[in-house]
Amino acid sequence: MAREFSLEKTRNIGIMAHVDAGKTTTTERILYYTGKIHKIGETHEGASQMDWMEQEQERGITITSAATTAQWNNHRVNIIDTPGHVDFTIEVQRSLRVLDGAVTVLDSQSGVEPQTETVWRQATEYGVPRIVFANKMDKIGADFLYSVSTLHERLQANAHPIQLPIGSEDEFRGIIDLIKMKAEIYTNDLGTDILEEDIPAEYLEQAEEYREKLVEAVAETDEELMMKYLEGEEITNDELKAAIRKATINVEFFPVLCGSAFKNKGVQLMLDAVIDYLPSPLDIPAIKGVNPDTDAEEERHASDEEPFAALAFKIMTDPFVGRLTFFRVYSGVLNSGSYVLNTSKGKRERIGRILQMHANSRQEIETVYAGDIAAAVGLKDTTTGDSLTDEKAKIILESIHVPEPVIQLMVEPKSKADQDKMGIALSKLAEEDPTFRVETNVETGETVISGMGELHLDVLVDRMRREFKVEANVGAPQVSYRETFRASTQARGFFKRQSGGKGQFGDVWIEFTPNEEGKGFEFENAIVGGVVPREFIPAVEKGLVESMANGVLAGYPIVDVKAKLYDGSYHDVDSSETAFKVAASLALKEAAKSAQPTILEPMMLVTITAPEDNLGDVMGHVTARRGRVDGMEARGNTQIVRAYVPLAEMFGYATVLRSATQGRGTFMMVFDHYEDVPKSVQDEIIKKNGGNA
């Protein structure tokens, strides 16, 4: 079957925003106007097409990034709707990794909000070009130019309007196109009847001012255009559009549009902008990877002629077809029924069926091409971030960074029947979500689940009940602490056992030094002259890794430490891998005496929004919770406080804030970094855990 849409006519986009900015409604309207659905589903009625999980429809928020494909102006647009809630950050990260462009949706009353900053930062890390859609122009307090100013102030983004609204709140009735210098007036409720006319006289001066600002800003990114502009020559609409496209794709410029998805205004123009300004797979740099056989860096271009290479970015369990693996094809062609190599795991996988997804309905297709996003049935060993490639042209693509979980809960099944089902349910949920971890406490036999926040674990426990019919008791949330060393030290680990039969002998000298935050554990072999034989070196590293899983102070994992094995000795007969593993763990215990071990706790970036009258209360809350204020901002009669607060102090804060502000205060928090706990708190944690120190 030949390719339906050329690569030039393909767009892979994500829709990203702060929770409640109207992102899912915007996606719904896109599906409506592109002919994918015939009736519009409203999020607040729990009928949205993209939010297809029961919990999503009940809570009115998007949890998983549903993928769908639509058509507009003879182009194929693959859309991923991502969650705006911080607990589901991995969903945003994995979609950004496989997208070519994104639409950032703002609530035009609030402008840039905390989660907008988080997803914007992530999109910048991945180099994703963006256009901005200032939504909810019909809402009381909507202010388009204020929203644009927040893009400059909070994100330092080179963002400029390519449209202006005609009216706002109840009076919002159309849009001025600053490129064509025409007005688009909406004459019916469904937004399908649009009149193009001259700009109303009362808006003309403002339109000319912003057109001038737009031309100047775009000219700064394009030398040729700059010369024309400075010489006072006429810049044609086509030249302006081409320059905006180029600057947007280079992530140097962000076009800002406006509208109201709920009132069906501005969505078609936003779709036009997706086609006009966001990149096709051909416009983005070739994907880089490593050949697992040669360790050489290789790249794959967006071409059907190159060998097949794809990245699995999401696993989902579908009630009808079972395990679905969502993947983005970077190069080559894949047919259903064929075999691929999972180079990340070194496993051969058979592609049973290939499905094109539309939220939770599906259409079976025979072939996928470079630039496509699809789902496959039949992959057994593939997980998020794995590379799938042609067996004869291996490449491992850069994987997806998975943040460490910061909160944990104990779960126990209510009955023996639930016990067996719970194991299956938890492993399936962990397959789908890499930030969700399941561990069994060896000493107590308890099952501990960890995740990115209370809502995250709440939703997963809820899914366990609904989808897998498992009833479970859930404990109170606990913080995932870590341990580290703050001083450098050298330590010997000596293990010798002679008691009849074969003896054991292992002897190592290891230098431990603190590592940079977030770097994890790094091992260096500095043995010279074979004082520790090469075959035992991996055993030393393994012994350290295993011992570090259970820290020296309170049993929390040790992180961010470098270990350099520099000396030791061995016995011709009695030395073994086991002996060197034990010796390494003894060296770690010895080092702990002088390496200033300390406990680390997760620090959250908390953004509290409260009425001005309650500012004193909020500042008191932060101080009482061992927090430190990072910044404040007044917005009308509301104050926004940003602070770093330990996660351990934030449990139950929603209730405290609600009662202090009569229900008018809200807060959001996102994990930021780990920090040393104060000595008094450390002593408490050690005591509570029957400390190892």
UniProtKB/Swiss-Prot annotation:
Q: Which residues form the tr-type G domain?
A: 8-282
Q: Where in the cell is it found?
A: Cytoplasm
Annotated GTP binding lies at 17-24, 81-85, 135-138
- Tell me, in a sentence or two, what this protein's role is: Catalyzes the GTP-dependent ribosomal translocation step during translation elongation. During this step, the ribosome changes from the pre-translocational (PRE) to the post-translocational (POST) state as the newly formed A-site-bound peptidyl-tRNA and P-site-bound deacylated tRNA move to the P and E sites, respectively. Catalyzes the coordinated movement of the two tRNA molecules, the mRNA and conformational changes in the ribosome.
- List the molecular function annotations (GO) for this entry: GTP binding; GTPase activity; translation elongation factor activity
Which GO cellular component terms are attached? cytoplasm
Protein family membership? Belongs to the TRAFAC class translation factor GTPase superfamily. Classic translation factor GTPase family. EF-G/EF-2 subfamily.
**InterPro entries with a match to the protein in the record:** EFG_II, EFG_III, EFG_III/V, EFG_IV, EFG_V, EFG_V-like, EFTu-like_2, G_TR_CS
State the name under which the record lists this protein: Elongation factor G
Please verify whether the record's keywords include GTP-binding: yes
GO terms for biological process?
ribosome disassembly
Q: Which UniProt keywords apply?
A: Cytoplasm, Elongation factor, GTP-binding, Nucleotide-binding, Protein biosynthesis
